[in-house]
């Protein structure tokens, strides 16, 4: 296991920024709140620990990256408080979602990790996705030790290609194993260049992702939004479809939000899933 040194820096974030809500918002599956109060984030070969100090102050400690990398990751160039204000008053349900989800931000994550993660996510609950992704990382990801904490980086395409079908199945991937194998083989050979796809416009990016084995509209939209920062893309899963039927009379509301559609979707998703689970727990 490779022991790494962290760079510490005091950072101030005055905009909407709630780490618990971000972690539970369904867009990321490896970030975690640790028992010592730190929040750990992994992205590609980069590692970050955030310790809240109060009044928007955080002790940030990172490896394999810099401050600008994480500012982009957390979309700190966008004013979410102002965005919520601009969206308010359009529907009572959206207003409740905006208030409830204050602190959520769209994370700009690693496209490779997003592709594999959301391939795994199909027909799985969020806890099950987290478990499968963590098993995959522990199976072949690079192990690191940082200030007493041991982590595993997300596997590269080459590392995944080195796993047998039985090893992948052992990570709880089930029928998704074939999808993971095909994506890893294409990315490893260069047939699939996820970095180059960043230059494509939204429609072309979406279409290219749909060509991959196992990628449907929901997975493609998730990769576009959370891997490439395409905020006009709004993934529609079971929760969102239920919300569209119950709150919007079956009419898809997202096209009217244009470049903010994906952000609106995230507020609605978080509110719908959180409140539905809360009601279920009370029964």
Where are these regions (language model features)?
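HhH-family (HhH-GPD) DNA N-glycosylase catalytic core used in base-excision repair
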Residues: 1-283
